Amino acid sequence: EAVKAQERYLNRFMLHKNAFTGIMMKDDPNLIAIEISNEPHHRGTGVEVTSFVSRLVGAVKKSGFKNPVLYNITHSVQLMDDYFKAGINGGTFQWYPTGLGYHKELQGNFLPNVDQYEIPFDPVIRKNKGAKIVYEFDAADINRNYIYPAMARSFRAAGIQIATHFSYDPMFLAFANTEYNTHYMNLAYTPGKALSLMICKEIFHSVPLYKNYGNYPENSNFDHFSVSYENDLATLNLPEKYFYTN
């Protein structure tokens, strides 16, 4: 009965009509994909997990949704093949290379922490032609400007197609981030970090998937981008476009 309830919820969620736009979720052009489960820890057998995930995928697709249906595959990784047997179109990932909730600013050079984004089970994903999307990432508790572009570089080297940052702070609480005080991101209060995140967008638009620039410190300069711990600096330098975080 619990699985039936989840199927019903997902199907009706996709058929929900936005009261402001009049568009159903399944038809919303801004909905590029849907993740049907976040960070699951499955205790069942592979066959049971495939059956469960398949039912949820089916409930979404039954609505008429045409875009990819994704599943968080970074937990219970021993079930990787079973996830794809269920008909998912790809996996979702996260990255917190400096941990979470240190309660004060971390000190030191963390570029070695983001040298590579390793996906040990990547052959399974590529065999199934699965999409790879990072739904949340941050170098938490680091109030510096240099690190985000290095993360974006490593994401692209790992074949990540889309990445979304966690999280942008609303202006009224950005001075202290009382919502979740391990992340700090706001254009007014952390302008250098905000510019650094803008550079990440440029990296995702220009760096090819799976392009590898080697290891730190040689990969601190790549294409038109550079990062420097010593200068707390990230840059994009093109004739028509120049971003400088400091």
Language model features by range: what are they?
Residues 69-70, 80-141:
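Glycoside hydrolase catalytic-domain groove-lining segments
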Residues 1-88:
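Active-site mouth of glycoside hydrolases
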Residues 141-223, 230-233:
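Substrate-binding cleft of secreted/luminal carbohydrate-active enzymes
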